[in-house]
Amino acid sequence: MGKIYSFVLVAIALMMGREGWALESESCLREQVRLRAQVHQLETRVKQQQTMIAQLLHEKEVQFLDKGSENSFIDLGGKRQYADCSEIYNDGFKQSGFYKIKPLQSLAEFSVYCDMSDGGGWTVIQRRSDGSENFNRGWNDYENGFGNFVQNNGEYWLGNKNINLLTIQGDYTLKIDLTDFEKNSSFAQYQSFKVGDKKSFYELNIGEYSGTAGDSLSGTFHPEVQWWASHQRMKFSTWDRDNDNYQGNCAEEEQSGWWFNRCHSANLNGVYYRGSYRAETDNGVVWYTWHGWWYSLKSVVMKIRPSDFIPNII
């Protein structure tokens, strides 16, 4: 009888243990569900915070690009004023970036991108890279300059007034670096590059050509078109200041400022088309002798340097 009683007690204890285990398991499951919900909630909040931070950073970046920043310029230590990027290079500053220069006859400093590669000392007067800047502008903008003087690949036009102040200092070489949408590169180089003053309507003068892209500026690629396609000794034109040789208005038709003739075999300030572009119009970023009139290039850099430049390797 005692054995039966003991067995019953053990059975009851086991049953109670199972019920307790079941209750404990159910409680653990509920706790797991609660914790998972909390984790999911926290993950959602973290993602929301990350999105907000990204938006704030983007807004700050846009404000920075709009306003510019002194911190975007490379500090020269207040050593002296420089007439162009070649002087900066030969004074020991070999890093490409934005610097401030003051040509000999300039009344004030202005910012410019110095390309310290490719032999160093290049003053960049124009850049096209992504179509972020509008180059269909009037006379005053082209005279004084416009664009992004903050980002290293930012688009800008240095200004006809500033280009004149640079090129009257001596004999300068112009180098034009071109890139297409198939990742090919080419260049055109001209000796004796000079832009006239305001009275000459910033007339273009170029000398001997060399390079791989062909001579689109002087129009010597074909004698029958040179009379209307050459840009040599052409005055600068904009939509509101027509100085070309065409009965119409080249700048208005091509939607850019340039040294138009009737109208062009090169227009590096033309409309920027994102992607390889071919059509029955020539108002893109054009260099005829490399890709013809109906191909708009991906990127352009126009840069100048004294023709007698000797790099200081120290």
Curated annotation (Swiss-Prot):
SMART domains: FBG
Keywords: Adaptive immunity, Coiled coil, Disulfide bond, Immunity, Secreted, Signal
All copies of domain Fibrinogen C-terminal, residue ranges: 76-308
Signal sequence segment: 1-22
Pfam family, one: Fibrinogen_C
GO cellular component: extracellular region
Subcellular location: Secreted
Any one GO molecular-function label of the UniProt entry: identical protein binding
Xref: InterPro entries: FIB_ANG-like (IPR037579), Fibrinogen-like_C (IPR036056), Fibrinogen_a/b/g_C_1 (IPR014716), Fibrinogen_a/b/g_C_dom (IPR002181), Fibrinogen_CS (IPR020837)
Coiled coil: 28-62
Organ and tissue specificity: Mainly expressed in liver. Also expressed in brown adipose tissue.
Note: Blockade of the FGL1-LAG-3 interaction using a monoclonal antibody stimulates tumor immunity and is therapeutic against established mouse tumors in a receptor-ligand interdependent manner.
The protein, known as: Fibrinogen-like protein 1
Organism: Mus musculus (Mouse)
